[in-house]
Amino acid sequence: MVKLRLKRYGKKRQPSYRIIAIESKSRREARPLEELGYYNPRTKETVLQTAGLLKWLRCGAQPTETVDSLLKKAGIYEMLKAGEGGVVASIRIPAMAKPEAGIPEAAEEAPATESVAEAEVADVPESELSEAATETAAAELSPPEAEVEKPQVEEAVEA
């Protein structure tokens, strides 16, 4: 039976783990069938290769409790139920960092300018936007009438 479990690496008292697919009877440090991501418990950073995880879960691999909780947080089981076949190559779950005093102020200012521009565009109905776009496109494509000289055609009338 194939298990999805953690393989420890890193310095003493600074563990990091690789998420691997391995035979259940193999020891922890044995050569894995496939490496499927990593997990750092100190920074809570996790990177998962969804295509590989979905493949092994479909084949019947059993995750350990820790790997199971990581897969739930990343939404792998929802992808498996929905039938997505590795649409996303990998998922990065960033660490939960505590915001500093100066960072939230800058973060609040930046979205405010973006929302003003979005509000201006949102106020104009979609039909007016499309009409205005076609008028400007037509004006750009056709030269002004003053510059274009139309040849006058004289029709000869035979008597």
Curated annotation (Swiss-Prot):
Key words, A-Z: Ribonucleoprotein, Ribosomal protein
Name of this protein: Small ribosomal subunit protein bS16
Species: Synechococcus sp. (strain JA-2-3B'a(2-13))
Keyword Ribosomal protein: yes
Compositional bias segments (type: Acidic residues): 120-129
UniProt keyword annotation of Ribosomal protein present: yes
Pfam families for this protein: Ribosomal_S16
Signal peptide: none
InterPro entries: Ribosomal_bS16, Ribosomal_bS16_CS, Ribosomal_bS16_dom_sf
Sequence ranges of Low complexity compositional bias: 102-119, 130-145
MF terms in GO: structural constituent of ribosome
Transmembrane region(s): none
Cellular component terms per the entry's GO annotation: cytoplasm; small ribosomal subunit
An annotated GO BP: translation
Segments of this protein annotated with the region Disordered: 102-159
PROSITE patterns in UniProt: RIBOSOMAL_S16 (PS00732)
Entry's family note: Belongs to the bacterial ribosomal protein bS16 family.
